[in-house]
Amino acid sequence: MILFTADWHIKLGQKNVPVEWATKRYNEFFDQVHQQSESCDMHIIGGDLFDRIPTMEELSLYFSFIRKVKKPTLVYDGNHEATRKNRTFFSQLKQASRDINPLVNVVDISYVDEDLGFGVLPYADLHRKDSIEHFDTKQPLFTHVRGEIPPHVKPEVDLDRFADFPVVFAGDLHAHSNTQRNIVYPGSPMTTSFHRQEVETGYLLINPKDWSWDWWPFTLPQLLRKTVTNPADMIPTNYHHTIYEIEGDIQELASVENTEL
C-alpha cells in the first residue's frame, strides 16, 4: 500500500496560534503518520509540506520527522514551496534530507517510478510547456494542482489535460470533499485556519496493484472559532485551540479585558 498525504503547511508563529500548541500538534501528527506507514510500502507527500520558506524552527520540525522515517518516502513540491517560476526551495533540501535519512527522496523535477508504474509532476514543472503531456497517460499521476471550487476558485490549468489518466492524486485543495473528475485530494491533515465546527481531515491509502484508494481520517487537534455573548463563556480548551468572538453593544464590549482567547 501507498500512504498519500499532502498540504501539511508546517508553520510556527501563525496569528492566534500558540507555538507550543502548534508544535505539539505537529508531533502528534508525525506520530500518527509513522504509525500508519508501518503497514505501507511507501509514503508520498504531495506538496505544500511547508507553508513558506521555513524558519530554523520549522526546519527542525521537518528534520525531526524525516529522522524517524522507516519506509521509502517521496516528497515533491507544491505552490507554497515555489520561490519563482519553475523553481522551488525544495532543491536545497534534497541532499540534506537524504543525508539525514536515505529513505527520504525529495523530487523537484518530473519523475517516473518504473517499478510501480506512476508519474510524479512537481509544482515546479507544472507550468512548463507540455509538462502534463510528457507523461504516459496509461499510468497514474501524482501532482499538486488547484482544482475548481465554484464559484470563486478556478483551476490553475485546464483540467481536461488530466482527463486521460486513470487517476490523478493531488495536493492543493484542503478538503477531500473537493475531489473532482479523476483528481483525488487527500486534503490537509491539519486545519490551517479557524473553523466554526470540527472538520474531517485525513489521508489516502492507495493499492498500487489496481490504483484503487480509500480515504481515512486523522484524529488531531483543530483550530476552532466560536461566537459568544457572555465573556464567561470564553472557556479555554486544552485539546483543540479555540478563539472567541464576542457579540454585544459597544458599552459591553468596551468592558471586556483583552485576553488570549
Tell where the protein language model's regions lie, with residue ranges.
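Conserved beta-sheet core of the metallophosphoesterase superfamily
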Residues: P151-W215
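Metal-dependent catalytic neighborhoods of phosphoester/phosphodiester hydrolases
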Residues: Q14-N16, G47-F65, D77, A82-N101, ...
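N-terminal active-site segment of His-dependent metallophosphoesterases
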Residues: M1-L61, F65, S131-K138
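Active-site neighborhood of phospho(di)ester-bond hydrolases with catalytic His/Asp-centered motifs
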Residues: F4-A6, H43-D48, T73-R84, P102-I109, ...
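Accessory, non-catalytic peripheral segments of nucleic-acid enzymes
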Residues: E38, M42, N207-L261
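Conserved catalytic scaffold of divalent metal-dependent phosphoesterases
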Residues: E81-R161, P189, D210
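Short, well-ordered alpha-helix to beta-strand connector turns
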Residues: C40, K70, T137-K138, F165-P166, ...
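Conserved beta-strand elements of the Class I
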Residues: L3, G117-G119, L204
